[in-house]
Amino acid sequence: MSMKRFGKAAYRIANELVAKGGRLPIFQRFLPRIFPATYNLGVHVVLKKAPFPRQNALRIARLVTRHGRVFRPFSSVIIERHRFQNQNDWRRKFQPIRKELPRNVDLVERIRQIFGNSLRYNEDLKSTEWPNRIDSYEFGEFLGQGCNAAVYSARLANSDAESSGNTHYGAGFNEVTNILAEIPPVSKVAQKKFPLAIKLMFNFEHDRDGDAHLLKSMGNELAPYPNAAKLLNGQMGTFRPLPAKHPNVVRIQTAFIDSLKVLPDAIERYPDALHTARWYESIASEPKTMYVVMRRYRQTLHEYVWTRHRNYWTGRVIIAQLLEACTYLHKHKVAQRDMKSDNILLEYDFDDEIPQLVVADFGCALACDNWQVDYESDEVSLGGNAKTKAPEIATAVPGKNVKVNFEMADTWAAGGLSYEVLTRSNPFYKLLDTATYQESELPALPSRVNFVARDVIFDLLKRDPNERVKPNIAANALNLSLFRMGEDVKQMMEKCGISQMTTLLAGSSKVLSQKINSRLDKVMNLITAETIMANLAPHLISRAERQLRATFLSRMNREDIWRSLQYFFPAGVQLDTPATSSDCLETISSLMSSFSNDSENYEKQQKPAKNGYNNVPLLLRNVIRTDADGINGIVHRVRSK
């Protein structure tokens, strides 16, 4: 048989396959499984939908003109490859046989990442766009007035009371599930009809056009607003606002300059701040001012301490939040300079709930990345109230080359506010003069105040700013005193052997044995675990306290923790026989057994270092103190034995 006959036979067979391929059972059975994309395009689209005339030439021409698949014979291969690569689970197909190298990540760094970068524990990570025109807001009742602004409640325009009250401002501890917590039923307060507060800044220069003078005179109010730099556009030179939001700094949603809105009570309350004031000979074509839109808070600290029963545990949480705010401001070289109880705002839903605290009113703030202020004449403003100025500020005398340092001014003011929280009276309002008082003249705190809080407050009010405790160290000490751990936190630390590891040297953790630091990591693991588990039991630990713990854990470091532990175990008499590292390790290991039934075999094979004494600095015996009247401030026990 010649090759010509073979060619004719193959040609006829091919024609029959093309003509009847769409109806062949074998194609219908295997093509969808092997090449689903090819089958859908080639069989369903081409063979079924296209009419097939008998003329082969016309049939081929129609296929070419309609689909062009003759010019792309391998297009199905590309389609299959694209489908395979887009599968979400293909990377996990060989996961059991993959071996990842262990990452050497420091435990403290991991804890900071968990509580600093997770939306669950840090609602400030969530951002919301807010309108920048005053017509987009509806004003409510008058809330208060100062020398430079009036504050009104507000909500977004064209929104009813229900939608405004349920406006969502961020995730976090407010979204804790109640299923596992088994929270007892409580009466909920009515939703706020006006959840915002708008600060209407007073413009006393309506005869000037433009926005530059408004930004220069009112820009300090934007210190806690992360987007302030974009609004100011370099008008304030060295002004450096806070780079991010913080749970204990007032939440500014947005700020903008717009036309002056004359409210019904404006003429009665602040006539001099209106463009209708009698001394203006001419005014700008469009009177403007700055508006600062903030979250609305329930009460000031001054109102709270006089309307609520004193609770020393609640007071300690409030003071710790205040110190967290001071720590954040100190870190970014921002001084609020007017730290008084009227400028501390609180938010809570129920009367017996521990409030969340924020520092507000930054109109007198110093935010130029420098603590020093040239004080050459009395015309230079040092900000704030005379009764709440730190001693180094109150005693400053103007002169040539005189500089005033505000680094520790807010920290000192926090000490006076701590007195007000615990006793309802700030000693510097009437009893003492900030410029002349002596530390021995400070009034005694109630005996039921926790000993750590008592010592921290006295150290905050040191006259010499160089001897004053840093805000982060003070905040650490109070935060550690608030951890429950199923017992008094001091007893827990004694079991851990921490009392034998504190030294007189600040920052001694750098030279501590690696093994001892690893045991400190175990303790921090327990504290972190308790904080995470508290998320499942919100009826035991308040929302404010959970947020406080997350803030503390998101910024902690070992060096500051060791320095803070001196408030629990102050340095005392030197050891006659210095403890070895093995003694510390055994003591620390004993702590683990008190929290886990499975820890009996924990590091039984751990061998002490041969040069253990050389790896540990000189250890000092510590004086163990207890609270007066035996009160440790524990309210609830997370774990009962």
Swiss-Prot record:
Its cofactor is Mg(2+). Residues 1-74 form a transit peptide. GO terms for molecular function: ATP binding; metal ion binding; protein serine kinase activity; protein serine/threonine kinase activity. Autophosphorylated. It is an enzyme of class 2 (transferase). GO terms for biological process: autophagy of mitochondrion; axon extension involved in axon guidance; axon guidance; cellular response to oxidative stress; mitochondrion organization; mitophagy; positive regulation of mitochondrial fission; positive regulation of protein ubiquitination. It comes from the Eukaryota. The keyword Transmembrane helix does not apply. InterPro entries: Kinase-like_dom_sf, MitoQC_Scaffold_Kinases, PINK1_STKc, Prot_kinase_dom. The keyword Membrane does not apply. One of its GO terms (cellular component) is mitochondrion. It catalyses: L-seryl-[protein] + ATP = O-phospho-L-seryl-[protein] + ADP + H(+); L-threonyl-[protein] + ATP = O-phospho-L-threonyl-[protein] + ADP + H(+). The active site is at D338. SUPFAM superfamilies: Protein kinase-like (PK-like) (SSF56112). Its EC number is 2.7.11.1. It is found in: Mitochondrion. Belongs to the protein kinase superfamily. Ser/Thr protein kinase family. This is Serine/threonine-protein kinase pink-1, mitochondrial.
